[in-house]
Amino acid sequence: MYYREFGIPARIGKCKDVEEIEKFVEQYNGKKNCYASVYVFDDEKLKAEGRTNYETALLNTVWFDFDDNKDVKKCLMDVRRFIRRFCKPLKITPRIYLTGGKGFQMNIDFHSPVDLPAHVKRQAIREYLKHLKVKYSLKTLDDICINNSVSCMRRIPNTEYISKITGEGTGVWCTQFSVEEILKMGIEELYAMAQEEN
């Protein structure tokens, strides 16, 4: 059976279904930042002490994390550039989220999982993301997330961003936006919607 990890951001649970994730979100949302693993993993192939075997990741998406601690507009510009130069020409519709903090998350989903040998999954995702970062000049594409690839944790949509400085909720929620909204709206409008939506 497959499971997804839950974190705050430290990994504290293995969720076998949406209901288990929702229980964690109900417990921690508004108190801690809520994260889930990008990929699901096979619980029949755990490592020693029940640790996750990241080589069992089911590769059904490619995940992008755009971050800039000083200017989130740079992230928006990178996301727009990638949509215009990569997604639109290939007729790809990504899922895009304003994280509520200083960046965006994007997923490009596959029609079916990519079947790669277990020992090359991490390297394949990492090298592909590095290639895209260079080719499309994605300066805000997070190198730490690229290097972690299959073991990355992503902010859970519809959860409140908690300030790392104050430990308090900011009133800004991780919110999904359409490609059209991302291409047309300014950063202030996007943040305003991320506050209103929830």
Predicted regions and their residues:
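DNA replication initiation on ssDNA origins
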Residues: M1-T61, F66-V79, N148-M153, P157-E196
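Histidine-centered divalent-metal-coordination microenvironment in nucleic-acid enzymes
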Residues: T61-F64, C87, K91-P117, M153-T159
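Aromatic- and Lys/Arg-enriched surface recognition patch
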Residues: V120-K164
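Catalytic micro-motifs at enzyme active sites that drive phosphoryl/nucleotidyl and oxygen chemistry
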Residues: K47-Y54, I83-R84, L90-T99, L141-C145
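Short, charged, solvent-exposed linker or helix-capping segments at domain edges/interfaces
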Residues: A118-H119, E168
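Long, well-ordered alpha-helical scaffolding segments within enzyme catalytic domains
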Residues: K74-I92, V120-S137
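A generic structural signal for short coil/turn motifs at secondary-structure boundaries
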Residues: D71-K74, V114-A118
